[in-house]
Curated annotation (Swiss-Prot):
Enzyme Commission numbers on file: 6.1.1.14
Record organism: Streptococcus pneumoniae (strain ATCC 700669 / Spain 23F-1)
Entries under NCBIfam families matching the protein: glyQ (TIGR00388), PRK09348.1 (NF006827)
Family: Belongs to the class-II aminoacyl-tRNA synthetase family.
GO annotation terms (biological process): glycyl-tRNA aminoacylation
Gene3D superfamilies: Bira Bifunctional Protein, Domain 2, Class II aaRS and biotin synthetases, domain 2
This protein's record includes keyword Ribonucleoprotein: no
Protein name in UniProt: Glycine--tRNA ligase alpha subunit
Length: 305
């Protein structure tokens, strides 16, 4: 019987595979976020005309999902392996299935289904056509073709593939609890993450200072606006991410009502839309440096008309 891949070997295998497909291997973005989609390597790069192919691991924090380390499959923080390709390759689904084969999962021997599940992120004004990928009855991946990001229509279309690494590893290693996943030889997932899970859950549900978080949200929102007034897209987006995480902490604490919740989401969305528009304008001002010369000259000429 062959040795099962460790968590980090799964990551290395996916990195090598998508590197071979022409993706840049980015590093996790150093700001709290609820999903890999919110990284600027996806959110910003999915808009505008320039090509972009990237893959990266993204730790994703969802305070309301914390369970004190007591639930075998629900986590405050989980890991996503994010792949974004723009324009979307025509064979992206075939490439995905090939990536599973590299992990030792033969599509001919397993029940792999693409279940329609169109995607939407109201807090960033983003949406797309999507599918959940189910492997023998368990969701392991979200597949999305972005139609709108930051309130802007995407052209060309970006394909996003988001692997749920904990679920994938649980399946490959045949364990029922994420905490039993072998991260590396001789080191279990729980030995690294169960204490942080407990502490972050306790903080999110019991300890966080609601008044401070409310004040911080207002300050982060204001600072994002100040950065945008100066045309500073990336610092502004950092504060949008901070607003989002702060809201998630408030939500986990039960500090916002249903009515207030919609208002906070709208405030984040409005900022994200301005960031998106400003980013596209910035790339145009820079002359769309990632485009090939012929396309770049043609597009700039059209924009000038």
């Amino acid at each position: 019987m062959s040795k099962k891949l460790t968590f980090q070997e799964i990551i290395l295998t996916l990195q090598q595979f998508w590197n071979d497909q022409g993706c840049m291997l980015m590093q996790a973005y150093d700001n709290e976020k609820g999903a890999g989609t919110m990284s600027p390597y996806t959110f910003l790069r999915a808009i505008g005309p320039e090509p972009w192919n990237a893959a990266y691991v993204e730790p994703s924090r969802r305070p309301a999902d914390g369970r004190y380390g007591e639930n075998p499959n629900r986590l405050y923080q989980h890991h996503q392996f994010q792949v974004v390709m723009k324009p979307s390759p025509s064979n992206i689904q075939e490439l995905y299935l090939e990536s599973l084969e590299k992990l030792g999962i033969n599509p001919l021997e397993h029940d792999i289904r693409f279940v329609e599940d169109n995607w939407e992120n109201p807090s960033t004004g983003s949406a797309g056509l999507g599918w959940e990928v189910w492997l023998d009855g368990m969701e392991i991946t979200q597949f999305t073709y972005f139609q709108q990001v930051g309130g802007l229509a995407t052209s060309p279309v970006t394909a996003e593939v988001t692997y749920g690494l904990e679920r994938l590893a649980s399946y490959i290693q045949e364990v029922d609890s994420v905490y039993d996943i072998e991260w590396a030889d001789g080191v279990k997932y729980g030995e690294i993450f169960i204490q942080p899970e407990y502490e972050h859950s306790k903080y999110s549900f019991e300890i966080s200072d609601q008044e401070m978080l409310l004040e911080n949200f207002d300050k982060f929102e204001k600072e994002a606006g100040r950065a945008l007034e100066e045309g500073l897209v990336h610092p502004a987006y950092d504060y949008v991410l901070k607003c989002s995480h702060t809201f998630n902490l408030l939500d986990a604490r039960g500090a916002v009502s249903v009515t207030e919740r919609a208002g906070y989401i709208a405030r984040i969305r409005n900022l994200a839309r301005v960031v998106a528009k400003t980013f596209v304008a910035e790339r145009k001002r820079l002359g769309y440096p990632l485009l090939d010369e012929e396309t770049r000259v043609k597009l700039l000429a059209e924009d000038a008309e």
